[in-house]
Regions:
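Positively charged n-region of N-terminal signal peptides that target proteins for export
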Residues: 1-5
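Bacterial N-terminal signal peptides
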Residues: 7-15
Length: 780
């Protein structure tokens, strides 16, 4: 969702043009909010009383969500959005920054609308508010559920202090194609890991299960699961493109993370832009009602993505906006983001019998229940706390948490000769267009970022070195040779454009003087993210050419690769001795990077996406099905009449789960408590000894994979089923155990039933998806 990307002026221009709300003398009295004891009524009783006083159009208006636009404090009532709120024509607003602006709108809703129903106030708090954490793809590389929960807590604490009560996160779309820009916003290619991390983030945001009637704390906000569903499976990795897949693949590979977040108690769900079974997701009854509500038991409300009801017309399944609104409502969509479809047309649809007032009541009640659970009926201003607004945003405590989390997300891909960590001595050349940029380090979808407060990589290194070494700096290059391409990837986050030859010569000159060269290169923040698909995943031309010149100098070179997706680093892997994938590490990335590259902390991140050797391998993922003609080794050269390519071997450059450390880990033999288990008497444990064989205390991520050898349908070559992030002191050994549960062996069969089938399985444990210890298990 990004408001600037969709041009629907014919829908959004002018006032809402909805039927006038009847104001009879008897209806002017606002609903009672408390019992005689001063406590708010129970949720059902409260909402029953409120809805009994609402007109049909007022109920429909609760289903309307709009961008608030530019609000000036004191003049909000005179704006278009303020006027519509006063008329009771809006249930929520989103993407406003400024407590005073939000309070002004909430004032109008409470004091000027007939029933005084408070607003939902949403924002894309995707990986932080002003304290920005690493992009979600980077966060997943921490494999740290407690850190993920803390990210949600801090994000909610800051957003709620700024007047926000609803975030459009987590995104758990499985993405197998790195060409798709929004891979940056999810948790990678694995359904189990994505579900676990998404659930942890949701728990952090909300602090409560919104399937219950518990009212959230004032420093927590409602989460929104997105994009439901399959958005990450767009063809060719092209934004907003068609999705076409079998239901059996949906159920086994794509839907599990959404279900995990629903089971974690998420309060709302956002529908996706794409087709599902050739029907727009927003109008897909099977997905929105049969799967989401009936099968998974979701109790919250469904909001569309930006203007996606209007986009039903472009998909060609509705003749006009009125029909599109009917399709969306009847499918199970409750709230319309920015199409103005519901608020304009549903009253007429009720009059014509196309939808019923009970359909409207159902959607309205779901939204009012969310407001109740947010505590807005108890205190509409609980998210407008001026004191918290001054103390809880971008605090020293929050910044330290972000710094610590960022350090866990960096993935060390290569470290030839233990070049890293660097010593604080001699002369260090810092070169690259991303070394001294302030507004790119936070990454895409940093809506509320305050870059003027952030520290660049250059500034952080100067502070970390503290005179112990000399830091030499040169930008070195533009992002692209083509200025138009650079503008496309900036989206307002600019990097100075300079003379290519002059910048290159400056970089080569300081490199000659230096003992070691550190290169900060790669993508800008918005070369990944929404509407940022790429057909070539290699480092942009002019940067790679500079890197090649630096590599020829015979000096030690460290590449800090900035990216919002898996990129192609085949040339770099061959020629650069040390490579660290640093993604976009958020507001504190400068200090966090210095913690790691100078050795105060040890890198522990592991990839949650397979990194390709070439763009032509995409989509690329570890948990694929076998073919009838497999190659025995993913990295073997071409074999005739086998499933492979002429020019590149099948395997990734770096596999899923991979990441190096400043120490080494040794895995002993894998042991099972039994090699046979009966379905009616299930107890099986896998154990393995892991030893830190290096000289540094460090974290390791121990990964459990399972393969179903023979089943009624073809099963993946391996699937992640568990992991443990452990800390081992230098020389320490520990026995790690995994309970193998029946749930780990279940899958959806051809009848879409969730089953365990007896047979043979491989149990695998290791430090990444390629290097594993294996034992066999038979289920009877």
């Amino acid at each position: 969702m990004r408001t600037a990307f969709i041009s629907l002026s014919f829908l959004l221009a002018g006032s809402l043009m909805v039927p006038a709300i009847a104001h009879t003398p008897a209806s002017k009295k606002k609903v009672a909010t408390t019992t005689q004891k001063g406590k708010i009524l129970p949720m059902k009783e409260y909402i029953d009383q409120l809805m009994a006083k609402m007109t049909l159009q007022e109920k429909i208006s609760q289903l309307n969500l709009m961008v608030a636009g530019d609000i000036t404090t004191g003049g909000a009532l005179n704006t278009q959005v303020g006027g519509d709120i006063a008329k009771g024509n809006m249930g929520g607003v989103f993407n406003i920054k400024g407590l005073d602006k939000i309070k002004a709108l909430q004032d109008i809703a409470i004091k000027n609308s007939r029933l005084g129903i408070p607003l939902l106030v949403g924002m894309d708090v995707i990986h932080g508010y002003e304290t920005i954490f690493p992009i979600p793809l980077a966060l997943s590389c921490s494999w740290d559920t407690e850190a993920m929960k803390k990210v949600g807590e801090v994000s909610a604490k800051e957003a709620s202090a700024a007047g926000i009560n609803w975030t459009y996160s987590p995104m758990v779309d499985i993405a197998l194609d790195a060409r798709w820009g929004r891979i940056s916003e999810g948790n990678g290619e694995d359904p189990y890991l994505s579900g676990v991390m998404g659930a942890a983030l949701t728990q952090g945001y909300q602090g409560a299960d919104m399937r219950t009637e518990e009212i959230l704390r004032a420093d927590r906000i409602m989460a929104c699961l997105k994009h439901f569903a399959l958005y990450g499976a767009v063809e060719s990795g092209k934004e907003y493109n068609t999705v076409d897949m079998s239901r059996i693949r949906m159920m086994n590979q794509y839907l599990p993370p959404y279900e995990a977040v629903v089971k974690a108690g998420v309060g709302s769900v956002m529908s996706s832009f794409n087709l599902i079974d050739y029907t727009p997701a927003t109008a897909n009854h099977w997905m929105m009602t049969d799967v989401l509500r009936k099968q998974w038991g979701f109790k919250g409300f469904v909001v569309t993505d930006y203007a996606s009801i209007a986009e039903i017309l472009n998909h060609g399944t509705a003749k006009d906006l009125k029909e599109a609104s009917e399709q969306a409502l009847l499918a199970g969509t409750d709230m319309d983001m920015c199409s103005n479809a519901f608020v304009k047309h549903l009253a007429q649809s009720v009059a014509e019998g196309k939808v019923t007032e009970e359909d409207i009541n159902t959607a309205c009640r779901r939204i009012l229940e969310a407001k109740y659970k947010l505590g807005l009926f108890s205190n509409p201003y609980r998210y407008c706390n001026a004191k918290r607004n001054k103390t809880d945003i971008y605090s020293a405590e929050n910044r330290q948490i972000a710094r610590d989390v960022a350090a866990e997300t960096f993935v060390l891909l290569k470290n030839e000769g233990n070049l890293l960590p660097l010593k604080k001595q001699g002369k260090i050349a810092l070169i690259g267009p991303l070394a001294d940029t302030r507004d790119n380090i936070a990454g895409t979808w940093s809506v509320a970022q305050a870059p003027e407060k952030y520290t660049t990589i250059k500034e952080a290194m100067e502070k970390a070195l503290d005179g112990k070494a000399t830091l030499l700096y040169a930008q070195g290059s533009n992002i692209w040779r083509d200025r138009e391409l650079q503008k496309n990837g900036e989206q307002g986050k600019s990097i100075a454009w300079g003379d290519e030859v002059k910048m290159k010569n400056e970089a080569l000159q300081i490199a000659k003087e230096a003992d070691v060269i550190v290169c900060a290169m790669g993508e800008t923040a918005d070369m990944s993210g929404e509407c940022a698909s790429r057909t070539n995943l290699e480092m942009p031309d002019v940067q790679q050419e500079l890197l090649a010149e630096l590599a020829k100098m015979g000096k030690p070179v460290v590449l800090l690769n900035f990216a919002g997706r898996p990129t192609v680093l085949s040339w770099e892997n061959e020629h650069i001795p040390a490579i660290m994938n640093v993604w976009f590490g958020g507001s504190e990335v400068g200090d966090a990077l210095c913690d790691v590259i100078f050795g105060d902390k040890v890198p522990s991140g592991k990839l949650t996406t397979s990194m390709p050797k070439t763009t032509g391998q995409e989509p690329l993922y570890y948990n694929h099905q076998n073919t009838g003609r497999p190659v025995p080794d993913d990295n073997q050269k071409f074999a005739k009449f086998a499933s492979n390519c002429l020019d590149v071997s099948n395997g990734p450059l770096y596999p899923f789960g991979y990441g190096l450390s400043y120490t080494t880990f040794e895995y002993g033999d894998l042991k099972l408590s039994s090699h046979e288990v009966n379905m009616d008497d299930w107890k099986i444990t896998a154990t393995i000894n892991v030893k830190n064989t290096g000289s540094r205390d460090a974290d390791e991520i121990v990964q459990l994979y399972i393969r179903d050898m023979v089943a009624s349908i073809s099963r993946p070559v391996k699937e992640l089923k568990g992991f443990q992030r452990i800390h081992l002191a230098a020389g320490e050994s520990r026995e790690i155990s995994f309970d193998i549960t029946p749930e780990m062996l279940k899958f959806y069969n051809a009848e879409l039933k969730h089953v365990i089938e007896p047979g043979d399985f491989q149990i695998m444990v290791g430090g990444n998806s390629k290097e594993v210890k294996i034992q066999n298990l038979t289920v009877k």
